[in-house]
């Protein structure tokens, strides 16, 4: 039974009438462009075929009833006429409540909804299960009540909910790719203008995500430190963001900067340039050049931004040794654990899976999780 069938069956069973709509919003993986989003730079993610699915129907009153199928059918119920506050014990509820609260501030021409939610985006793997949930909930209200909101507005609404209601800092990339993703394409996103250009993926290439299953511990504190270091760099150049600094300008005065800040700045500037070039390499089907850019990106994250860990570097080395120059691999996500992403010809996937299975656990003592994904469509009815 797929997620649509599961949520529709549960909806009818619990609410006693059939759902009118089923909405999905995908998770994502970022192919290249790491820690560039909050520097107003470029990212190149694609939506993946793991998603949050919501079966739903409008109500004729002002109540929102939500069932979380993946949390033992826990229930949340709240009114649109009372102030929406955080739920004491159910963290998942706060993503739903936050999205609805921020939607009210944008366009409150909507009424109550019944919904049943289920998803298969792996949690804690850095594949944006939370953004997928936020975009799915926003799309439910937009579709049921014909709200005049586009994908970018639904994405911004989800980001606001996560930053201000849930209380977790994030850039805009995760929500934007979930809302705007396009089947068989990646999206080159300008994080300053929110402009997005669809970039076709070469045929016969698999998007492979391998979770190191190394538990991230430093990610919050170190993430904030990196942001501060980038802001320090932008102030040094008297620019609003590192997006506005050229590599030439940086190289001319790099020695005057604090050495650690200089390394952080160099990563962001070089990563932005790599990301823009990667989009054109993908479009041309030049997997060899894409692989070189991904390798440079990983080295920059390891040596200049210092956000990789030995387990991740080991995974990258195993994959690279298997594929040679027929594709690319790098860490993806915030760092300090999490996943690597690889672009690999489909016929090489079994060899990569076998090499990782034979070597990774032997070298690290941890068993990996292996996902083979397809670049998928963004949020909408399913």
Curated annotation (Swiss-Prot):
Site (Transition state stabilizer) residue list: 28
Localization per record: Cytoplasm
PROSITE patterns: GALACTOKINASE (PS00106), GHMP_KINASES_ATP (PS00627)
Enzyme Commission no: 2.7.1.6
GO BP field: galactose metabolic process
Annotated metabolic or biological route of this protein: Carbohydrate metabolism; galactose metabolism
Keyword terms, alphabetized: ATP-binding, Carbohydrate metabolism, Cytoplasm, Galactose metabolism, Kinase, Magnesium, Metal-binding, Nucleotide-binding, Transferase
Family: Belongs to the GHMP kinase family. GalK subfamily.
Record-level GO cellular component terms: cytosol
TM helices/strands, residue ranges: none
Species annotation: Salmonella dublin (strain CT_02021853)
Superkingdom of the organism of origin: Bacteria
List of residues binding Mg(2+): 130, 162
Protein name per the record: Galactokinase
Enzyme class name: transferase
Alphabetized Gene3D superfamilies for the sequence: 3.30.230.10, GHMP kinase, C-terminal domain
Binding site for ATP: 124-130
Matches recorded under NCBIfam families: gal_kin, PRK05101.1
Catalytic activity: alpha-D-galactose + ATP = alpha-D-galactose 1-phosphate + ADP + H(+)
Annotated GO MF terms: ATP binding; galactokinase activity; magnesium ion binding
Residues annotated as binding substrate: 34-37, 223
Active-site residues, record numbering mapped to chain: 174
Name of the encoding gene: galK
């Amino acid at each position: 039974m797929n997620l649509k069938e599961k949520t529709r069956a549960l909806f009818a069973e619990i609410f006693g009438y059939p759902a009118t709509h089923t909405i999905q919003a995908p998770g994502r993986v970022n192919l290249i462009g790491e820690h560039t989003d909050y520097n107003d730079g470029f990212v190149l993610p694609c939506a993946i075929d793991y998603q949050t699915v919501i079966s739903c129907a409008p109500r004729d009153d002002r109540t929102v009833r939500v069932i979380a199928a993946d949390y033992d059918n826990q229930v949340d119920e709240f009114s649109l006429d009372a102030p929406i506050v955080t739920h004491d014990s159910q963290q998942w509820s706060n993503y739903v409540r936050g999205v609805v609260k921020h939607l009210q501030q944008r366009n409150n021409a909507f009424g109550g909804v019944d919904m049943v939610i289920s998803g298969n985006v792996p949690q804690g793997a850095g594949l944006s299960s939370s953004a997928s949930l936020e975009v799915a909930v926003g799309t439910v209200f937009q579709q049921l009540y014909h709200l005049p909101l586009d994908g970018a507005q639904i994405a911004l609404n989800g980001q606001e909910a996560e930053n201000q209601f849930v209380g977790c800092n994030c850039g805009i990339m995760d929500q934007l790719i979930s809302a705007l993703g396009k089947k068989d394409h990646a999206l080159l996103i300008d994080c300053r203008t929110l402009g997005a250009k669809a970039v076709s993926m070469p045929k016969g290439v698999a998007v492979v995500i391998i979770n190191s299953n190394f538990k991230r511990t430093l990610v919050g504190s170190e993430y904030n430190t990196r942001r501060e270091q980038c802001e320090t760099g932008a102030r040094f150049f008297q620019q609003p963001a590192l997006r506005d600094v050229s590599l030439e300008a940086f190289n001319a005065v790099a020695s005057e900067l604090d050495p650690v800040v200089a390394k952080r700045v160099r990563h962001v500037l070089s990563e932005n340039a790599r990301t823009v070039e990667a989009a054109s390499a993908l479009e041309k089907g030049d997997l060899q050049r894409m692989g070189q850019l991904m390798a440079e990106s990983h080295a920059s994250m390891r040596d200049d931004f210092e956000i990789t860990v030995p387990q991740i570097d080991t995974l990258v080395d195993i994959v690279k040794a298997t594929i040679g120059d027929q594709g690319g691999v790098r860490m993806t996500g915030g760092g300090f654990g999490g996943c690597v992403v690889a672009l690999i010809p489909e016929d090489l996937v079994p060899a990569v899976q076998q090499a990782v299975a034979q070597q990774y656990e032997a070298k690290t003592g941890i068993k990996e999780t292996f996902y083979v994904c397809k670049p998928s469509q963004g949020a909408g009815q399913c």
